[in-house]
Amino acid sequence: MNQKALKTLEYDKIINQLTEYAASPLGKALCQSLSPSSDLEEVRTWQAQTTDAVTRIRLKGSVSFSGIRDIGDSLKRLDIGSSLSIPELLSISSLLTVAARAKAYGRHDADEDGRETGESQDDFDSLEPLFAGLEPLTPLNSEIKRCILSEDEVADDASPGLSHVRRSMKVTADRIHTQLNSILNSNRSYLQDAVITMRDGRYCLPVKSEYKNQVSGMVHDQSATGSTLFIEPMAIIRLNNEMRELEIQEQKEIEAVLASLSNQAAPYTEELRMDMELLAQLDFIFAKAGLARHYKCSAPMFNDKGCIHIKDGRHPLLNPQFVVPINVWLGREFDLLIVTGPNTGGKTVSLKTVGLFTLMGQSGLHIPAWEGSELAVFDQVFADIGDEQSIEQSLSTFSAHMT
């Protein structure tokens, strides 16, 4: 499609508005890459998808696609047998949660067949393959959620080994605190504060520097002023060593849990990739529906004979309170249309409306016009508006030149 015409007709502003209705980065990327098609059947397919999404929203309410993650790199790592990190597994879980939500939304229940509105399930058929293709992989998602509580925390019961190590860590930590509290109470006058602190992963006491020889142990740090030394008492060095060994064991157990979850996800890389692509596509289609509802649009009919009939068309970039609807027909009784009138009379807006509607329609977007409006599919759209002033500036071609 002619890039100058896209710019002149301010197609990019419509695309930017469309992008705001997508919930995910992947959906937004599809919005930004949208360009008009010159294939009549493809245009009709796109229009049907937008229409079906609008119908679903009207009958069932909106569905949220928030939570779709780009897991492409993670899937490549699974394909070569690598283990995934906690954030990567959580991204897979987030994607599957959205897939489950979308699949449930796309399912036709007995009481949602449109009987109250007189509409039937057949109205949704163009979206059926997309919803049907989603694989929520519920067992995998449930296992990830059971094992991983957040990006910073793996559940104690993620594995028997991890559960055992953490119980041992709690026992050891209790013993350390008991020992330190005893030392703290008997040496309170030597301490800067009656608190237990951590330095380099070791439990320490804050000792006044002038009493450093009164508390036997290893110095791990000192305060900025040098008045406080953080000393690990000799009495707990063995316990601190035990705790450090347990922490190493804990990390190994966590890595084993992540490896196990990765192995469980590995056989489903194709399903996960398909989920990601289908959800991005659905997010994109429902963004079109959101834009259509915002502008109170309708689905235009299409032909390949060059016929245009716009009924009460409203330019989408103009203030809806002041925009004057236009009626345009062209291509049946006559093929050439000359628009005349005084300066600031709306000629440029009318021409831009016809051009922009054509671009929007061929992109699968509904147009802000009455039902029954008709557009044609063109291989190219050309526009020469002279100064190419913005519609939103409300300037005529003449007054813009004068400016």
Q: What label would you give each PLM region?
A:
Residues 1-151, 157, 161, 268-271, ...:
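Conserved amphipathic alpha-helical "coupling/scaffold" segments
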Residues 136-152, 238-259:
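Extended, charged coiled-coil "arm/hinge" scaffolds of SMC/Rad50-like chromosome-maintenance ATPases
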Residues 163-212:
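Extended, Lys/Arg-enriched charged tracts that mediate electrostatic binding to polyanionic substrates
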Residues 12, 44-47, 65-68, 96, ...:
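Amphipathic alpha-helical transducer elements in NTP-driven molecular machines
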Residues 294-298, 303-403:
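ATPase nucleotide-binding head domains, primarily ABC-like/P-loop NTPase cores
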Residues 165, 169-172, 246, 250-285:
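Intracellular alpha-helical coupling/juxtamembrane segments of multi-pass membrane proteins
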Residues 199-230, 240, 302-325, 329:
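SMC-family hinge/dimerization module
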Residues 184-200, 289-312:
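Long, charged, glycine-rich C-terminal linkers/tails
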